[in-house]
């Protein structure tokens, strides 16, 4: 064998070995990459929408009819009047509630909404911005059954007393149905004040 033939064989063997090593390394890293669970997305909430109206009278009538059937719903104005029956941290967390509404004849859809950009409308007022961002994080924590922590400065001077009161209720309440109502009310107050 000549030196030239030996170099060609060595190069070919190197290419083949390199391809095998690259293939196996690629497969091992492909299998170890974390699977992103959509319920772990930060800043999103899921809302069970029962209806949507262009006028407040239709929304109020719907709310009255729902209350007569034993459901507490919130009217949230965001360009149109949305009627929400529940709020959750994932679509799965709303599945049982959705079934109970559908059993009473309501047609429901689940809406996904990103919350963390809501305070951007008041970014010039740092104190209010921090308050509302903390409220959003506390609402998300409440939906995740995590601890709600309210800064001491807001006990002295809350930006929005109604929202602050709702969050302090969420911080201590044990009744799950009242907690669900307070969570939906907190969402309504956030949208009402930030959009």
Which residues does each PLM region occupy?
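Acidic/polar low-complexity segments and flexible, solvent-exposed patches
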Residues: 1-195
